[in-house]
């Protein structure tokens, strides 16, 4: 278990607990509501806590670096009762009694977008794994998916008005799997691509179900609780109930610890039970937490990187640890169930931060991993189609945030983390709450030791597009080329990856990326040269699939050319829809990042599939050769002439014995 990992619970007030000892660390209440606090959410760097009350008086952002201190108040009097942060903690989604879902920009402290598709009170909101969609549920039983990139909402789906949706959660492994619980005790797993039930667990709870939570380390496991005092564990593959426990009191809140082995469950009598999944007969610990019912429990994000996540290295997405992303075993396309932690937010492309060349060159394998970041992984056997649905949408609906938005919101000086051996690194410098600079001197950030081989890097989504000095760019390019030769040993692969990056660059430049005739052209070309190095380093670090060797360069070249051409066309079409010389908004850049990431994932999956097919074909050929060899041995190992001669001699011997 991570040292000093904490969790927060809400009831009549907010309390912060030590996760290992279950002892009280702090308590506070920034709200004036007599009905308690209904929703809480940690920021990605664990330094801030966002809260909303049951009466919807306001949304409060509090600093929890030292003593809890309210810093920011939003939505005063707007009756917002449920909150959720995106993976970068730059945007906050809320819903409440006014039937509205609001997206807040925490830098400007204003409503970024307001969605009024619900007909009744919004009870729960959540972002999906890549922050492109928001799922919200209401008292009327409706579930609506809102696209952040296209500003479109799906047709409401659900089970009817008699089934108020009480809680929604996305699976951490199957990106298109959404779980919901309702008042009539039905637990439903939804396929968000088709907006139809993947499976209904009917009448598993005899009273209203109150919470659902997916395991952060096991792709098959999730748990629900209800007012019938039941804790039920499920298997998503067999669609069966694994185990049912009965507690002493009605249960109201649940969350998994990042290690995946511990559950924290709140009850209507203010108690919190800690269960160990390895011995589920009774709770390991029980504490009296609140005077009223426990309405919400939220664990901090884990900042521990395990060996398995390091081995995965450059697989998909960057670093600390987030509920919405979990490592996937590249060898089998399945999930590596041991030692996986929640991975923290970042963008969809591995972020490259400038590092000293000498230290990077001296670290061997880890040097390339650190250069490319430690990316999040996505599930290769269930690729979500959610982002695909927004690829062809017109970007004209996006709000242009102006030139200053790129520099002010995502400052490269503020967001870039400097990695030094043996030094302490503040976790989450690139967090969305850096809009509070005056607090840095008052509340020093919580320090966490960072080793040279497992450095956790934080940056804003735009760091991959920020320009850097030409000398450093050339050094990064040379280092990447040398590392490439060491790990791949294939000049053809290098050429194919460069071809991909050049096509991306040409497609982007043809889409009117320039904001000024001279200097911005150079900056824009640098923005796309960095992802070229990054893509190459990311694919270099990918371990061999199923222990096989590097794919055939001819196959890789042909697949890469097709993928690159289609990707450049999509990017050019998307950006070309903007008005002339308009700067890219953060949403557009994130959309392009997601598009590139998904294309790389498709390419990686295609390579994996080709290698598996090749191995299967080789096995078939070997089997056919074995059978042919057996038949030839049986056919030619026996000499028919000799056998006939032996039989003739035997008959002759018998005849001679009979006569003489």
From Swiss-Prot:
Which stretches of sequence are listed as region Disordered?
369-411, 507-532
Name the Gene3D superfamilies for this protein: YVTN repeat-like/Quinoprotein amine dehydrogenase (2.130.10.10)
**PROSITE patterns named in the record:** WD_REPEATS_1 (PS00678), WD_REPEATS_2 (PS50082), WD_REPEATS_REGION (PS50294)
Task: Please tell me where this protein is predominantly located.
Answer: cytoplasm
For this protein, the record's InterPro entries field holds: NEDD1_Spindle_Assembly, WD40/YVTN_repeat-like_dom_sf, WD40_repeat_CS, WD40_repeat_dom_sf, WD40_rpt
Q: Which PANTHER family match?
A: PROTEIN NEDD1 (PTHR44414:SF1)
Job description of the protein: Required for mitosis progression. Promotes the nucleation of microtubules from the spindle.
**Name under which the protein is recorded:** Protein NEDD1
* Organism per entry: Homo sapiens (Human)
């Amino acid at each position: 278990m991570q040292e000093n990992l904490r969790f927060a619970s809400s009831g009549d007030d907010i309390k912060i607990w030590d996760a290992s000892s279950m002892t009280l660390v702090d308590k506070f209440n920034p709200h004036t509501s007599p009905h308690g606090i209904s929703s809480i959410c940690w920021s990605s760097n664990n330094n801030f806590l966002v809260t909303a009350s049951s009466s919807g008086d306001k949304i409060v952002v509090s600093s929890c670096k030292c003593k809890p201190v309210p810093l920011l108040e939003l939505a005063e009097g707007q009756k917002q009762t449920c909150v959720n942060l995106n993976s970068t903690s730059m945007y906050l989604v809320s819903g409440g009694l006014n039937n509205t879902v609001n997206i807040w920009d925490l830098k400007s402290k204003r409503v970024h977008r307001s969605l009024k598709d619900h007909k009744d009170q919004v009870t729960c909101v959540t972002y999906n794994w890549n922050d492109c969609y928001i799922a919200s549920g209401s008292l009327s039983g409706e579930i609506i998916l809102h696209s952040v990139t296209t500003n479109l909402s799906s047709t409401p789906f659900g089970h009817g008005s008699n089934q108020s949706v009480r809680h929604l959660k996305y699976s951490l492994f199957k990106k298109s799997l959404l779980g919901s619980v309702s008042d009539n005790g039905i637990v439903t797993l939804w396929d968000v691509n088709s907006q139809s039930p993947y499976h209904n667990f009917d009448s598993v709870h005899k009273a209203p179900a109150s919470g659902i939570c997916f395991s952060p380390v096991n792709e098959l496991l999730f748990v629900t609780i209800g007012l019938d005092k039941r804790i039920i564990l499920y298997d998503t593959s067999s669609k069966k109930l694994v185990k049912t426990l009965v507690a002493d009191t009605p249960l109201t809140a649940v969350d998994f610890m990042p290690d995946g082995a511990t559950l924290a469950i709140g009850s209507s009598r203010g108690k919190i039970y800690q269960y160990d999944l390895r011995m589920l007969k009774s709770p390991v610990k029980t504490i009296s937490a609140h005077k009223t019912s426990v309405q919400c429990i939220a664990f901090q994000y884990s900042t521990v990187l395990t060996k398995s996540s390091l081995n995965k290295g450059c697989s998909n997405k960057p670093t600390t640890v987030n509920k919405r992303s979990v490592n996937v075993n590249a060898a089998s396309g399945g999930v590596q169930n041991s030692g996986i932690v929640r991975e923290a937010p970042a963008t969809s492309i591995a972020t490259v931060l400038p590092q000293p060349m000498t230290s990077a060159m001296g670290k061997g394998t880890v040097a390339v991993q650190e250069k490319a970041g430690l990316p999040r992984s996505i599930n290769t056997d269930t690729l979500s189609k959610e982002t695909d649905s927004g690829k062809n949408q017109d970007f004209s609906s996006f709000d242009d945030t102006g030139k200053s938005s790129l520099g002010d919101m995502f400052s490269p000086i503020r967001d870039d983390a400097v990695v030094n051996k043996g030094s302490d690194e503040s976790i989450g410098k690139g967090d969305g709450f850096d809009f509070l600079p005056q607090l840095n001197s008052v509340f020093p950030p919580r320090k966490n030791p960072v080793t040279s081989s497992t450095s956790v890097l934080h940056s804003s989504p735009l760091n991959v597009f920020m320009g850097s000095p030409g000398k450093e760019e050339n050094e990064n390019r040379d280092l990447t080329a040398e590392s490439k030769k060491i790990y791949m040993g294939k000049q053809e692969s290098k050429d194919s990856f460069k071809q991909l990056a050049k096509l991306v660059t040409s497609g982007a430049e043809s889409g009117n990326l320039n904001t000024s005739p001279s200097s911005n052209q150079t900056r824009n070309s640098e923005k796309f040269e960095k992802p070229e190095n990054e893509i190459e380093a990311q694919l270099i670090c990918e371990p061999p699939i199923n222990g096989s060797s590097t794919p055939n360069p001819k196959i890789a070249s042909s697949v890469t050319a097709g993928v690159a051409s289609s990707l450049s066309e999509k990017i050019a079409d998307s950006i070309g829809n903007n008005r002339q010389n308009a700067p890219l908004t953060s949403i557009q850049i994130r959309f392009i990042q997601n598009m590139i990431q998904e294309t790389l994932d498709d390419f990686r999956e295609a390579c994996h599939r080709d290698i598996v097919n090749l191995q299967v074909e080789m096995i078939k050929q070997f089997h056919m050769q074995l059978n042919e060899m057996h038949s030839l041995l049986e056919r030619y190992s026996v000499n028919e002439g000799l056998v006939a001669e032996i039989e003739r001699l035997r008959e002759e011997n018998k005849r001679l014995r009979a006569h003489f």
